[in-house]
Regions:
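Core alpha/beta nucleotide-donor-binding catalytic domains of modification enzymes
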Residues: 2-304
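AMP-forming adenylation/ATP pyrophosphatase catalytic core
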Residues: 2-12, 21-26, 31, 69-75, ...
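Residue-level detector of alpha-helical recognition elements and their boundaries
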Residues: 117, 121, 200, 230-233, ...
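Eukaryotic basic, amphipathic alpha-helical target segments in cytosolic regions
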Residues: 161, 306, 377-381
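Short, surface-exposed helix-loop/turn micro-motifs enriched in polar/charged residues
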Residues: 207, 286, 290, 314, ...
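Residue-level detector of well-ordered alpha-helical segments, enriched
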Residues: 214, 314, 365-369
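Internal, active-site/partner-interface "lid" segment
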Residues: 288-293, 313-323
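Inter-helical turn/loop segments and adjacent helix faces that build the functional surface
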Residues: 305-314
Length: 701
């Protein structure tokens, strides 16, 4: 049975202060109607429905004309993001009305620029597909018909003049873990989209999130007790980084793309209207109707409430106010960080408390400032919440700093000789030991095209826009609101929402919060039943390989071209035993322990090789000398140099440095401080975190 959709008047909202005049929306005599992807109406349909279907043909020209405001608003949002038609762009396409509407607008935007280029350039030749635009359909493989649907969507996107490809998902256990299907599917989907963008040298990915999605996320986070930063919803522009560094032919680099959501000013109804007005078909995902998922339950509740007065418009005003506050917080923490934080080459940060002046920084900005520093140092990208957030705030405001604190994967203490005016932020050894196998990995030398350089220029333009926007704002509504309830009450006091909207939001919050608590207990019980200790995988490194230790240090072992000329004994008859063992095998990577610098001191203090070999109390970490005085003299010189470097590094930071050992546990190399047991070991370590400070660029305009 075909389903008809009614298209009413078009009233897109635009908050980006553009200068595009919106033309008056024509009111057709008969509202245009359009079928979704259902079969065409047949003779067996009632006469009234058949007449309604046929009337679309007579009003399609009017509907097409009425899409002008959408095209203008889309172009304005893209310009606000610093993105121009000449940029190479990918579009995430599911085949639903949202992503198909995005394809319609992106295609028209690109084509308009192409027509202008054709008019300005002699001999311009257009291709079958829109230049610099790629649609990507991710087939999750969770339903039997998903492959057929993916091919159908791909063909429809190509029919619009947009090149499109399908990315299939492979699940280790056949499908995601029960209870986490949506989260797992989302994670895999973005990973597939990211991989294709990197492979195709595309720096921008468009996603079709709209204002109704923002309202759903607002209620969802409200039920989880999120503060104002979480209630700000999804970023307009954000940076997404690959989980692994990649090789560009010369060096290992951090690869990433810009995730742009240009449809946040449009509603779900607008998505249908754009598809209808462009005669574009779509599919409906049946899982969107399942009440198993919180998003779907919230969507249904919002749909029921949206018919009552000004409820939905009040919610959107509240979200806009939260986004304004978030923009201010991001601007403020960046300004403070530039003045008060130093990042050292050994992988730790130093906070200057006198320059920070934490007693005069509001809780919201200071919490975000500290959260970003801790996430950067630990490369543990989880939000700082609850007790941890309160602990770190109290700690940083205690001046002078005298105590130590372990929180969120980091160890904080007073910097030596600073009299408590500076705080060290180092990666926690406990966190490293529990997570080393998860976030340490060998790097692949499969060559990738260089990262897209134009991203830097886009980010620069976006930062200028955001800074100018926030500097022109004198009132910030929720800077001092500490909880979601505080935000709601403040919004009521400021007349952002009325009493009715406040009451309904509190009801939605309580209703979904109760379901969340019940589900959390179920998941906790399930997780306890399924608890298994992770395998204790040891990260090993062979000659010619590179690894990323804790996603923080890039360690590269270059094999020497002519080992025999480098590593011969004084009598030039045979190689040192220690070099032969390690250069023909592999080394294990671990973090530094206190005994390691004691070992370096012992090596420097030993008077002779013979005494070292005959001492039964010698450290187990000592290297066998094998009657190699030349090597031992080099070993002592290297240990002495390493100790000099080590003295400039605080003890807490030393413990996070990478150490390489052989199979017997003997220390072979500590590359960060220049120690190696033999000159033939060409190993170096560079602090190169996977994600930069602040998690990359984001905009909430």
């Amino acid at each position: 049975m075909p389903i008809f959709y009614l298209a009413g008047s078009i009233k897109p909202r635009c908050r980006c202060r553009c200068r595009y005049p919106y033309p008056p929306t024509p009111t057709p005599a008969m509202p245009p109607l359009l079928l979704s992807l259902r079969p065409s109406p047949s003779a067996c349909l009632p006469l009234r429905r058949l007449l309604l279907f046929r009337c679309f043909a007579t009003s399609s020209a009017t509907a097409s004309t009425s899409l002008g405001p959408y095209h203008a608003s889309f172009a304005c949002r893209m310009a606000l993001a610093g993105i121009h038609p000449h940029h190479r762009i990918a579009v995430g396409v599911s085949g639903g009305p949202d992503s198909m509407a995005l394809c319609v607008l992106a295609t028209a935007w690109k084509k308009a620029a192409g027509r202008k280029a054709a008019a300005d350039e002699e001999g311009f030749v257009s291709s079958a597909f829109v230049d610099g635009l790629l649609g990507v359909v991710v087939d999750h493989g969770l339903r039997p018909e998903s492959a057929d649907e993916a091919r159908l969507v791909r063909d429809r996107v190509r029919g619009m003049g947009v090149e499109c490809e399908i990315a299939g998902c492979e699940w280790p256990d056949g499908r995601p873990k029960q209870g986490h299907v949506q989260e797992a599917a989302r994670e895999v989907r973005y990973q597939k989209l990211l991989d294709i963008c990197i492979k195709q040298q595309i720096g921008i990915l468009l996603i079709a999130h709209h204002s109704d999605d923002q309202a759903e996320l607002f209620v969802l986070r409200l039920s989880r007790n999120s503060g104002v930063l979480g209630l700000a919803g999804t970023a307009f522009v954000s940076q997404l980084f690959a989980p692994y560094v990649k090789y560009d032919g010369e060096n290992f680099r951090r690869y990433g793309i810009l995730l742009v959501r240009p449809m946040l000013d449009f509603s779900k109804d607008d998505m249908y209207k754009i598809c209808q007005g462009s005669n574009q078909s779509w599919v409906e995902d049946p899982t969107n109707n399942s009440m198993m998922y919180a998003r779907n339950r919230i969507r249904a509740s919002l749909r029921n409430l949206s018919t009552e007065g000004t409820f939905l418009s009040g919610v959107h005003k509240l979200i806009s106010a939260c986004r304004l506050t978030r923009t201010h917080v991001d601007y403020t923490w960046n300004m403070i960080a530039n003045q008060s934080v130093s990042i050292l080459e050994y992988g730790y940060a130093v906070i200057d408390l006198e320059k920070l002046d934490p007693l005069n920084v509001d809780d919201l900005c200071l919490s975000q400032y500290l959260a970003y520093i801790l996430q950067f140092v630990s490369q543990r990208h989880r939000p700082l919440r609850g007790r941890s957030a309160r602990l770190i705030l109290d700690y940083i405001r205690t001046i002078p700093c005298k105590a130590a604190l372990t929180v969120a994967g980091c160890y904080l203490c007073a910097a030596p000789r600073s009299k408590g005016t500076k705080v060290l932020v180092c990666c926690s050894v406990d966190w490293m030991e529990s997570s080393s196998a998860e976030i340490s990995y060998k790097c692949s030398y499969e060559e990738q095209a260089p990262p897209v350089l134009e991203i830097d220029q886009i980010v620069l333009e976006g930062c200028l826009q955001s800074n100018q926007f926030i500097q022109n704002r004198s009132t910030l509504p929720f800077v001092y609101s500490k909880s979601s309830i505080d935000v709601l009450n403040k919004a009521k006091d400021l007349s952002i929402i009325d009493d009715s909207t406040l009451e309904k939001l509190c009801y939605l919050r309580a209703d979904e919060h109760d379901k969340f608590i019940v589900n959390e207990h179920k998941h906790e019980e399930h997780d306890l039943e399924e608890t298994k200790f992770p395998d204790c995988n040891v990260l090993s490194l062979c000659p010619g390989e590179t690894c990323h230790f804790m996603s923080r240090f890039l360690i590269t072992w270059k094999a020497p071209e002519d080992l025999n000329e480098i590593c011969l004994h004084e009598n030039k008859e045979y190689l040192s035993k220690i070099c032969t063992v390690n250069l023909n095998g592999s080394l294990e990577v671990r973090h530094m322990a206190d005994a390691d610098w004691l070992f370096l001191a012992e090596v420097c203090n030993v008077r002779s090789v013979e005494e070292n070999l005959s001492d039964p109390k010698a450290s187990s970490g000592k290297v066998e000398m094998n009657n190699a005085p030349q090597h031992y003299r080099y070993l002592q010189w290297s240990a002495h140099k390493a100790l000099q470097n080590l003295r400039s590094i605080p003890a807490a930071a030393r413990r996070t440095l990478p150490v390489l050992t052989n199979a017997q546990g003997d220390i072979v190399c500590i590359p960060s401080i220049g120690f190696r047991c033999c000159p033939s070991l060409l190993i170096q370590a560079v602090f190169y975190p996977r994600v930069p400070l602040g998690g990359g660029y984001s905009s909430y305009l």
